[in-house]
Curated annotation (Swiss-Prot):
Protein name in UniProt: Elongation factor P
Keywords noted in UniProt: Cytoplasm, Elongation factor, Protein biosynthesis
Organism domain of life: Bacteria
Tagged with keyword Nucleotide-binding: no
Its biological purpose: Involved in peptide bond synthesis. Stimulates efficient translation and peptide-bond synthesis on native or reconstituted 70S ribosomes in vitro. Probably functions indirectly by altering the affinity of the ribosome for aminoacyl-tRNA, thus increasing their reactivity as acceptors for peptidyl transferase.
Species name: Flavobacterium psychrophilum (strain ATCC 49511 / DSM 21280 / CIP 103535 / JIP02/86)
PROSITE patterns (alphabetical): EFP
Database matches in InterPro entries: Elong-fact-P_C, NA-bd_OB-fold, Rib_uL2_dom2, Transl_elong_fac_P/YeiP, Transl_elong_KOW-like, Transl_elong_P/YeiP_cen, Transl_elong_P/YeiP_CS, Transl_elongation_fac_P
Stored NCBIfam families: efp (TIGR00038), PRK00529.1 (NF001810)
Gene Ontology biological process: peptide biosynthetic process
Gene3D superfamilies in the record: 2.30.30.30, Nucleic acid-binding proteins
Entry GO CC: cytoplasm
Protein family according to the UniProt entry: Belongs to the elongation factor P family.
Amino acid sequence: MASTSDIRNGLCIKFNHDIYKIIEFLHVKPGKGPAFVRTKLRSLSNGKVLDNTFSAGHKIDEVRVETHTYQYLYAEGDQFHFMNIESFEQITLDKKILDNPGLLKEGTNVMVQVNTETDLPLSVDMPASIILEVTYAEPGVKGNTATNATKSATVETGASINVPLFINEGDKIKIDTASGSYMERVK
């Protein structure tokens, strides 16, 4: 059992008969009254986000997890296939456990958190950014660009991303995997 002082981003806890991953937390010490911790939890079974407040000193049930590096192989419907790069063991994960599956490119390394008690995968952490090639980009209309004008572009994985007007087919772009947004053009 851990206490609220042990809370950190990425910690997996058992709460309300489900396993949650802490996305955000904030220790609050008001002028009057006891301290507390505001948390944002994501359910690892269904992906829903829950806001919860723990009082200071509250005991939480920490879930022991191991992190392994897996390589993305291919997708088959809603099933995504990965291979452990150390043991070459293959696993199949459901689409709902992934944050942004449309950005996964074959050969991409991801970090898979596995519950040590049940050996079940809990979550998949993609790299912070990924470089993909633009396969289709709408033509950019010059003029009327007083603001940050964007257009829709399709990348090699089939995902649609909003990009600046100067991006053309064949360009490689860097994409933030957490938000799925354009970061920069790569030379």
